[in-house]
Amino acid sequence: MELGAPTEESGNAGLVAIDRALEDYRAGGFDVLVTAPLNNNENFQFSGQSRYIEDHLCAEVPSISVLVNEKLRIALATRNLPLNQVSASLSVERITKSGKLLYNSIMRDFRISNPRLAILALNPKAGDNGLLGSEEQEIITPAIEALVGEGIQAFGPYPADKFFGDSYWEQFDGILAMYYEQGLTPFRALTVEGSVNYLAGLPLICTAPEITDNLEIAGKNIADPISMRHAIYLAIDTFRHRLEYDEPMRNPLQKLYKERRDDSEKVRFSIPKRRDNREGSND
């Protein structure tokens, strides 16, 4: 292998490393995984490390990629799709599922109770009442209503330009973008340093620095370690947050009351009444 030059051997070595890591995780060897950028090759039949890890770890468990820095958490409803395929890939079910994953992750992994979610529109001006597209009326708004119906604080759909241009994003704990460029462009524009890609929804805590492989600077001692450092810190924090969140759920206190089936009134468990000492006092 040549330093700074992508080769088939180097690409295969990266895959072997990920496969071994997943094997060790299944054997209980560790709790968190932090990955470095991987140079794709023809043997890499997945669109990105996140999909590869998800499909090889437990395909039935849903996950969502969340871009994280000190100010933003942006998730993507679709991942690595050509722009002309995004609209057909969106559905009420998909957006609802993505919103739930983001909401649950923010509560459990970031320890924010009752987070506020912003859902971005797909079309310019949020479709302009159907003149610029119907996805907002037919798909995105019903998905938001479904999330609200389940007790989730979801708002939108917001036009991306106004949402970020007028700093609406500062009022939310999480943002759901519809496609790659819609989420990545403002994220990178507003990120000074230390951006991380977090794969939420899996039992394995998995983070990665949001950077490319940058092979052209290999061996020059000029690579910035901040994103990798933040990826490691986020993995550690997430592990601790999950312990804190899960601990009270393991042995919950039993109810001191039960509900009667014939009405909604709560009835306390049968407790013998204290005998009135005054009864029979005249005898």
Regions picked out by a protein language model, each given a short descriptive name:
Residues 1-49, 93, 97-178, 182-189, ...:
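Contiguous, glycine/small-aliphatic-enriched amphipathic segments in soluble metabolic enzymes
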Residues 50-62:
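A glycine-rich helix N-cap at a beta->alpha junction
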Residues 60-74, 200-216:
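Short, flexible loop segments at boundaries between secondary-structure elements
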Residues 67-97:
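Ligand-binding beta-strand-loop-alpha-helix segment within the catalytic cores
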Residues 71-72, 80-82, 122-124, 210-212:
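Short connector loops/turns at beta-strand edges and beta->alpha or beta->beta junctions
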